[in-house]
């Protein structure tokens, strides 16, 4: 029985260590959720906050992203935040929208004609530092940037590149989307993460400038806004975003989701979404996690993050079980050792009383160095 307990304890300890290592690895596996870590360059802490907008009759537009951007800028000015390096940015943001299109035409420079290049594409209009938040792996070429003058450049994912041109070496080639000509800036791949692969749209993806959506006659409804903001105290960054929507009730001790329930948007603090308190909260709400009261079509990176959350919660529950088993085994072994002890508290106390009371009393009768006082113990 003793050997079995030792084996079970060792197994539990090893399992707990392995699960902790796996959880640490999984929590860092999504680059889309770790922008704050990449952005932080000094002692100042940062938090990544995302806003997901509903698809309603009165949708949010690019102007709403600009308003939120202005709110954050003003709040950081009020807080007197300054970049550690002169000329550097103190914070960063990005916004995006995803639309489906039925067809795209490829431009053949040799003949000067256009021809169909497949159908059913997903088009992502992106603004700000989108590819800093979502660093897709480049296969060829470069990303597109908000600061560039030409907004008719695009990044294709590998499936879109192959469907259009049957090649990945296509930088500089052109295609036509809803009558507007675009030039290929680069080809990118979403990566090998399992959850990203499952959540990624089945239709080939084209990334274009957000400002080009309206020119191409596409829906400009805002889907997602993201920002990495200084977070010197808990909930500071999130509170700034909430204030933009008229809510200013966040404190360090308040439940994160309570103020959000008053809004038609969903606000997520990506930075600590896999922390122990959030995982514990996720387990307590596991039954209701599939229930949604908002008409929001999440982008693939958020769906992947939510799938990863489920994985993390299962790993966390397994780690709790291993830790509990190890604790029970250790406590039971301590109890066994105590019950089988060869010493008793009563004997210990009697010895201490004899040492510090009787010897103290008899020391008054000691008359020489060789006299220990033992004789006086029997003197009448």
Enumerate the language-model features and the residues they cover.
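Juxtamembrane interface at the cytosolic side of transmembrane helices
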Residues: 322-373
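Solvent-exposed, non-transmembrane alpha-helical starts
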Residues: 58-67, 116-120, 150-152, 192-204, ...
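N-terminal membrane-entry
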Residues: 303-325
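Hydrophobic secretory-pathway targeting helix
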Residues: 1-37
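Extracytoplasmic
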Residues: 44-46, 118, 148-151, 170, ...
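Mid-to-C-terminal secondary-structure elements
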Residues: 129-138, 156-244, 250-300
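The feature marks short, hydrophobic/small-residue-biased sequence motifs that occur predominantly
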Residues: 92-144, 148
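Membrane-proximal extracellular/periplasmic loop immediately following the first transmembrane helix
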Residues: 25-102
């Amino acid at each position: 029985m003793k050997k079995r307990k030792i084996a079970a304890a060792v197994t539990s300890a090893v399992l707990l260590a392995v699960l902790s290592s796996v959880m640490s690895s999984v929590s860092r596996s999504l680059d889309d959720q770790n922008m704050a870590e990449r952005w932080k360059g000094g002692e100042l802490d940062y938090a990544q906050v995302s806003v997901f907008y509903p698809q309603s009759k009165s949708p949010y537009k690019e102007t709403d992203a600009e308003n939120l951007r202005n709110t954050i800028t003003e709040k950081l000015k009020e807080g007197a935040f300054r970049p550690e390096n002169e000329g550097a940015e103190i914070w960063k943001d990005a916004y995006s929208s995803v639309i489906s299109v039925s067809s795209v035409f490829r431009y053949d420079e040799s003949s000067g004609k256009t021809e169909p290049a497949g159908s059913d594409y997903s088009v992502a209009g992106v603004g700000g530092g989108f590819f800093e938040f979502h660093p897709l792996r480049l296969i060829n070429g470069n990303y597109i940037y908000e600061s560039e003058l030409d907004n008719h450049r695009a990044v294709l994912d590998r499936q879109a590149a192959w469907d259009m041109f049957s090649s990945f070496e296509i930088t500089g080639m052109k295609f036509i989307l809803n009558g507007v000509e675009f030039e290929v800036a680069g080809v990118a791949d979403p990566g090998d993460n399992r959850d990203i692969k499952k959540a990624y749209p089945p239709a080939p993806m084209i990334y274009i400038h957000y400002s080009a959506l309206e020119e191409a006659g596409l829906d400009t409804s805002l889907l997602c806004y993201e920002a990495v903001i200084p977070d010197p105290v808990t909930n500071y960054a999130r509170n700034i975003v909430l204030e933009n929507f008229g809510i200013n009730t966040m404190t360090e001790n308040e439940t994160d989701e309570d103020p959000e329930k008053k809004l038609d948007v969903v606000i997520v603090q990506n930075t600590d979404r896999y922390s122990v308190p959030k995982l514990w909260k996720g387990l307590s709400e596991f039954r209701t996690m599939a229930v949604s009261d908002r008409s929001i079509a999440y982008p693939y990176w958020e769906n992947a993050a939510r799938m990863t959350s489920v994985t993390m919660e299962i790993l966390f529950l397994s780690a709790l079980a291993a830790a509990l088993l190890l604790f029970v085994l250790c406590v039971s072994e301590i109890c066994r050792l105590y019950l089988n002890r060869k010493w008793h508290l009563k004997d210990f106390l009697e010895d201490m009383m004899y040492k510090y009371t009787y010897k103290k009393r008899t020391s008054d009768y000691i008359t020489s160095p060789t006299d220990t006082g033992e004789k006086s113990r029997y003197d009448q």
